[in-house]
């Protein structure tokens, strides 16, 4: 599989800066045009780099897309890890306030994320098991808040939270609906009530 080939990891600061610029350009191209329509030539041009420089670090578009998705996932997982550390000090409402809009905000900040994860007929290695991985991260946050919770139960609760987060994404995608923010606030309220129930006021 082309996407499983290795991207070249630069050793020098200049090389790392170049790779960061190439990934940023790739994100803009994928978000604007979609995976299939974006080309290595257009990505290099947007980055102000030569096509040879792009191929030096990323031999195929699949490798480039997979590297970008891995970077996005590392950022998102880092966000969950920070929330896990803070969870014991948060009540249900504060926890819901952090969780309910989290993926909406992340996708807005990284618009190429959805096309890379959801491209029909194409599955990047980094996209494998993404939903299950998010569910485990949510479960870890809930377990940090309620240390005595069994793993299986945490995963059930996490799946409910995940569905509410997906509902927030769905309503945010209805751009013709002018009350999207109000609906997301209501979803947060529903999540807070649910967390208050399942966490038992912990």
Please name every model-derived segment.
Residues 77-78, 94-109, 123-148, 155-159, ...:
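Amphipathic alpha-helical packing segments from all-alpha helical-bundle domains
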Residues 21, 25, 29-63:
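Helix-turn-helix
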Residues 42, 65-72, 127-130, 134:
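Alpha-helical DNA-contacting segments of helix-turn-helix folds
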Residues 68-95:
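Amphipathic alpha-helical linker/stalk segments
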Residues 21-29, 75, 98, 102:
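Pre-recognition alpha-helix immediately N-terminal to the DNA-recognition helix
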Residues 1-17, 199-202:
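N-terminal intrinsically disordered/low-complexity leader segments
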Residues 113, 140, 144, 162-180, ...:
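Amphipathic C-terminal alpha-helical segment
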Residues 84, 101-125, 139, 167-174:
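Amphipathic alpha-helical segments used for helix-helix packing
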């Amino acid at each position: 599989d082309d996407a499983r080939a290795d991207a070249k990891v630069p050793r020098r600061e200049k090389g790392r800066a170049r790779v960061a610029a190439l990934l940023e350009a790739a994100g803009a191209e994928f978000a604007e045009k979609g995976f299939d329509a974006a080309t290595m030539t257009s990505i290099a041009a947007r980055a102000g780099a030569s096509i040879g420089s792009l191929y030096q670090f990323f031999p195929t578009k699949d490798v480039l897309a997979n590297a970008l998705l891995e970077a996005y996932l590392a950022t998102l997982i880092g966000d969950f890890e920070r929330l896990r550390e803070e969870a014991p000090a948060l009540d249900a409402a504060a926890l819901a306030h952090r969780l309910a809009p989290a993926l909406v905000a992340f996708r807005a900040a990284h618009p190429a994320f959805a096309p890379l994860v959801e491209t029909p007929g194409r599955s990047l290695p980094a996209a494998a098991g993404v939903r299950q991985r998010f569910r485990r991260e949510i479960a870890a946050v809930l377990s940090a808040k309620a240390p005595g919770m069994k793993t299986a139960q945490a995963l059930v609760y996490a799946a409910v939270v995940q569905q509410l987060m997906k509902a927030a994404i769905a309503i945010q995608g209805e751009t013709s609906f002018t009350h999207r923010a109000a609906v997301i606030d209501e979803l947060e309220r529903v999540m807070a009530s649910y967390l208050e129930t399942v966490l038992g006021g912990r």
